[in-house]
Every structure is written in C-alpha cells, then in structure tokens.
Amino acid sequence: MIRVLCVAAAAVFTTGLATAKDVTVGVSWSNFQEERWKTDEAAIKAQLEKNGDKYISADAAGSAEKQLADIDGLLSKGAKVLIVLAMDKDAILPAVNKAAKQKIPVIAYDRLIEAPGVFYITFDNVEVGRMQARAVLKAQPKGNYVMIKGSPTDPNANFLRGGQQEIIDAAGKKGDLKIVGDEYTDGCKPE
C-alpha cells in the first residue's frame, strides 16, 4: 500500500500538483466486492486525508463498460489523478487515453494497463504463483492437476500461472503429477 501512495505522489509531482493542496484523487475499482479492496481503500483514504487531499471513487461492479462511464464521472467530478484497478486491460484504454489528453496522471493499481505514461504498481505476482504452487504441492504432491488461471483479461493471471509453472515443472519431470487441464475463467468473479 505504501508503494501505491509513493507512486501517486510521484504522479502528482510530475504533473506540477506536488505543492497543491486539496488535490482530488479518483479511484476506479473494478469490483469492490473483494475484501482486499476495502482494506486498501481505507489506507488510501487515510493517507490522502492526512495530506489534505480529497478521495472520490466508483465501483464498476465487474463491468468493463460501467468502468468507462465511472472514469468519465470521476473526471467530471474534478479528479486530478486517477488510480485504476482495471476490470479489462484493453477495454479501459479509451478512458486512459481521455485522461492522458487532459494531462491527468493514471496509476494502474494491481492490474497492468499497457498505455504510454501509465504508472503501474503491484506486488510480485510471479512469486505469489510460486508460493501457491509450493503450498499445493505440499498438500497434494502427486496426482492430476487442473490449472484454473482466472480471467483472460487480467494480466496477473498469466504472471501467477508463470510462477506456478516454474515450481510444477520440476514435480512434473519426476512423474509425480500431470496437468490434465489448463483453462482461463471468463468473467472470473470473487463470489
């Protein structure tokens, strides 16, 4: 979380907003139903309030289309910095481009948005994938495995899967396990 705030500060600094007070930061959540985002939101709000800045947000509720409208709404409410947890890395691009034209810094939070000038902050997804694979292998070291990767529109699914594969390959070479399925989950939702 601290890194997110450091990147937000860097974005503000690079746009000349560093000395401004009462900067409005808009946060676009892809799916606020996950408990993690509520924890992160509390930390972001607290830091912004401490700095004398304003927090506004919108929840896309799992809809890439709604997220585009949400970002328009955040911009119309005066957001001078955007933090975006993208529902779909490609569908979000029109909103990111609109913000860029308005010289609004965009921070891709947790999910990569491949667009010029977008800051990206996340944890080490590959290492998390390795950790997941180690835990699964410890619990069930032999047998048939099905790999469920998450949404194909979330780049983290591939990063996690890459880390898992590094660990699983070694066990597979010993003949202890076999991958019998490897699928994305379209529209992956927390419920």
Identify the function of each model-found stretch.
Residues 18-191:
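A residue-level marker of the well-folded mature domains of exported/periplasmic proteins
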Residues 1-19:
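Gram-negative bacterial Sec-dependent N-terminal signal peptides
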